[in-house]
Amino acid sequence: MGHEVAVSAIQLATAFSAIANGGYLVKPYIVEQIVQSDNKIEKHNNISYKRQIADENIMREIKKMLRQVITSGTGVEAEISGWEIAGKTGTAQKYINGK
């Protein structure tokens, strides 16, 4: 997502999920449920907040671009029949003569 920009994996996943969700940001969670020793299930997947951070039409256009990476770009090998896959091209910072 840019040179010299440090983000965690969960931050990156959250950003891309906002694109997939039409511009809505949802707090990420990792644990869906906990099963107690007595088989009682404790759910942890409640959406704690959801807010719109970008226009849905803009997100639709970004999704189209990310989709093209898979359908006709460098990510064609990632295509999975029956699934709508989107991807981002690789970003590299090239050094020439040590710079």
Functional labels for PLM-detected ranges:
Residues V5:
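Conserved phosphate/anionic-ligand binding catalytic regions in large, soluble enzymes, centered on
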Residues M1-G2:
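Conserved interaction-surface patches within small, structured recognition/assembly domains
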Residues I10:
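Active-site-adjacent helix/loop patches that line small-molecule binding or acyl-intermediate pockets
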Residues W83-K99:
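Short, Gly/Ser/Thr-enriched beta-strand-loop segments that form substrate-interacting elements
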Residues A13-I80:
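Conserved active-site-proximal loop/helix segments of enzymes involved in bacterial cell-wall
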